[in-house]
From Swiss-Prot:
Name of the protein described by the UniProt record: Uncharacterized protein Lin2081
Entry-linked PANTHER family: TELA-LIKE PROTEIN SAOUHSC_01408 (PTHR38432:SF1)
Family: Belongs to the TelA family.
High-level lineage: Bacteria, Bacillati, Bacillota, Bacilli, Bacillales
Pfam families the UniProt entry points to: TelA
Length: 399
């Protein structure tokens, strides 16, 4: 019980971190679009290519309304606000990427592999050949103690069984941790989806504002400047053009952040699927392979004890035959018939070998899945580090 306490405390701490850092709604991510305390803002979208469909057209009606409201908050005269547009969502995505990276880094299933290797070693200690009693050689071994006695063999297998029980308990704990990790990853997946939706709204709002600037505001200002010939009117046209350019670049940065959320979704699922496959193999070992191995060993030991009893009975028969010659024939016949009856129904040792071989193959396949999972997580970790660096470079380019 004491071994589980640190794990439980760690899981509770993990849940608190998830609740505190990631328990935000889509409205929270959109509440402060420019990343400032005192001014409201909106989001942006790239409309530089007419052939590309507008993101706003792909949103739900609710999200479309949110994008429209955000676009109204974008003030063309506020050049400084563009720098912080969508920054809150990007900051949360940055923290989220750190959490994903930390989770992948600490996901070392090496101990699980060590436990399975230990289980294979214990199973290989169980030599089916020493359970194969064959004719007189077995009786010679048992009575002259050339090799292990039945009691010694039984004691050995009881010890191995106890060790396997401990290993099974460790595997059960490992399976529980894998499923808890999958639950945590599911929460991360949901938060990644929220960030994706928030970025969609920011980008869609930017699209709307750019469309308004390019199709309405700029033409009106140009017409006014041409009519008045006032230099200040021309400056307003230039200022609005510069604002649209900055807004367009900011939308592009948000699209890069959106791409991060798109890539993270399958990566999270990949880790979850690997954990699930490994947990299923562990479950198969605990619930099927280990009990089957125990049953077969128990049957083999029982049959070996029966053969020992037959051997003892035969010796008694031979001794009695010497003392009571008149009963020799009857005792000999009874001993032979008893031996035949006891020999009937013995399990073929080859079956036990095949069962053990199947168990070991199952464990080897489990190790293979664990190794593949480690390799996939290593690839995911490298990709996350690369994406984080790319995000930092993009944010630095904004400055």
């Amino acid at each position: 019980m004491t071994e589980n306490k640190p794990s439980e405390e760690t899981n509770e701490l993990k849940d608190l971190v998830v609740e505190k850092e990631f328990n935000q709604t889509l409205d929270d991510l959109l509440a402060n679009p420019f990343g400032s305390d005192g001014e409201s803002a909106a989001s942006i979208v790239n409309n530089e290519t007419d052939a590309a469909p507008r993101l706003v057209d792909m949103l739900t009606e609710t999200n479309k309304k949110q994008a429209l409201e955000l676009s109204k908050q974008i003030e063309p005269g506020n050049q400084a606000a563009i720098l912080g547009y969508g920054a809150p969502a990007q900051a949360k995505l940055h923290d989220f990427s750190h959490s994903m990276l930390a989770h992948v880094q600490k996901q070392d299933v090496g101990p699980i592999g060590d436990i399975i290797s230990d289980l294979m070693f214990r199973l290989q200690e169980a030599d089916p050949d020493e359970l194969a009693a064959r004719n007189k050689n077995v009786f010679t071994k048992m009575f002259h103690r050339v090799k292990q006695s039945i009691n010694e063999i039984t004691s050995k297998y009881q010890k191995i069984g106890t060790q396997i029980d401990r290993i099974a308990l460790k595997l059960e704990h490992s399976k529980k941790r894998l499923m808890e990790d999958n639950s945590f990853l599911e929460q991360l997946y949901d938060k990644n989806k929220d960030y994706f939706q928030a970025l969609n709204i920011y980008i869609a709002a930017g699209e709307l504002k750019l469309e308004e600037i390019n199709t309405k505001m700029l033409p009106e200002l140009r017409k006014k400047a041409e009519q008045t010939g006032d230099q200040m009117d021309y400056q307003e046209v230039n200022d609005l053009t510069q604002f649209a350019d900055r807004l367009d670049k900011r939308v592009y940065d948000l699209r890069l952040s959106r791409q991060i959320t798109i890539q993270q979704a399958p990566q999270i699922r990949l880790i979850q699927n690997t954990n699930q496959a490994l947990a299923e193999k562990i479950q198969s070992s605990i619930m099927t392979a280990i009990p089957l191995w125990k049953n077969q060993v128990a049957i083999a030991l029982t049959l070996l004890r029966q053969q020992q009893a037959v051997a003892a009975q035969r010796q008694v028969s031979e001794t009695t035959n010497e003392l009571l010659k008149r009963n020799a024939d009857m005792l000999k016949t009874n001993a032979i018939e008893t031996a035949r009856e006891n020999e009937r129904g013995i399990v073929d040792i080859e079956t036990l070998k095949e069962t053990q071989s199947s168990l070991i193959e199952t464990l080897q396949e489990t190790l293979k899945i664990q190794q593949e999972g480690r390799a996939k997580r290593a690839v995911a970790e490298k990709e996350l580090v690369t994406m984080e660096q790319e995000l930092k470079e993009r944010l630095l380019e904004m400055k």
